[in-house]
């Protein structure tokens, strides 16, 4: 991460923001390491919060996040490569190999980003 104290990157700091501004769309970018479980709890708690896996190779995503994606978080996780950090030719095949249900994979790779950035709700 950047040369700043790690505690300022803890997603718990979004808790108060999500409460005060429920109409504001918020997205945690670059994953949430080492606070994945806190991030998932916040994603469950707030309808206006998403997480983007930019700069994370899909094969390195924690099982807790993959489980969340398959269950309660089908619309909450957004794929991104953070190119040129990770190349599309590497991360797209890794994402396809995650053994996600087809609807969850479609949401992860496209639908969730479309909905978040452009307001297009998808099934």
Task: Describe the residue ranges of each PLM region.
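Catalytic pocket-lining loop regions of alpha/beta-barrel enzymes
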Residues: 1-78
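Acidic-enriched, low-complexity/disordered segments with a strong bias for Aspartate over Glutamate
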Residues: 15, 33, 37, 82, ...
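Conserved, mostly hydrophobic/aromatic
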Residues: 30, 51, 82, 105, ...
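Short amphipathic alpha-helical interaction segments
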Residues: 56-60, 69, 83-87, 97-100
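Mid-to-C-terminal alpha-helical segments outside catalytic/metal-binding sites
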Residues: 73-76, 86-123
């Amino acid at each position: 991460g950047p040369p700043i104290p790690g505690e300022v990157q803890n997603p718990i700091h979004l808790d108060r923001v999500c409460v005060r501004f429920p109409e504001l769309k918020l997205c945690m970018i670059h994953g949430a390491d080492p606070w994945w479980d806190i991030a998932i709890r916040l994603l469950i708690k707030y309808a206006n919060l998403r997480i983007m896996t930019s700069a994370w190779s899909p094969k390195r995503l924690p099982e807790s996040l993959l489980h969340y994606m398959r269950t309660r978080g089908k619309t909450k996780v957004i794929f991104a490569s953070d190119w040129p950090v990770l190349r599309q030719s590497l991360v797209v095949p890794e994402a396809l190999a995650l053994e996600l249900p087809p609807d969850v994979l479609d949401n992860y790779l496209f639908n969730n980003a479309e909905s978040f950035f452009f307001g297009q709700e998808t099934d």
